[in-house]
Amino acid sequence: MARLVVDGEDVVLRLTLPERVLARRREVRLPLTAVREVTVEPDWWRGLRGLPRSARWLPDRFCLGEWRHPEGRDFVAVREHGPVVVVDLRPSAPFDRLAVSTPDPEGVVRAIRQVA
């Protein structure tokens, strides 16, 4: 399962080895100044918007990679059944949103809010 952590002045989405292979990237690193809002969505599918662009997904199982929508693009690492951390980003960031399934979503939100 992907991990969303604060590393110094950055928010980092670290992917597991299988996720790295599917997403074709090791991590997504963004400055904390790019974070506009961070919340927990109780249903995993609520973090998704738009359509997959360079993404892998299995319906009702997982979604991983870049999703396009009319306002821009999001990076998602979402697994079925469970809450997701949704990080909405400022226009200067390469993505508009990160949506991530994590083992402790409330803890991740607290950690980001403390430093952002």
Feature annotation, model-predicted:
Residues 23-32, 36-116:
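Acidic, Ser/Thr- and proline-rich intrinsically disordered linker/docking segments
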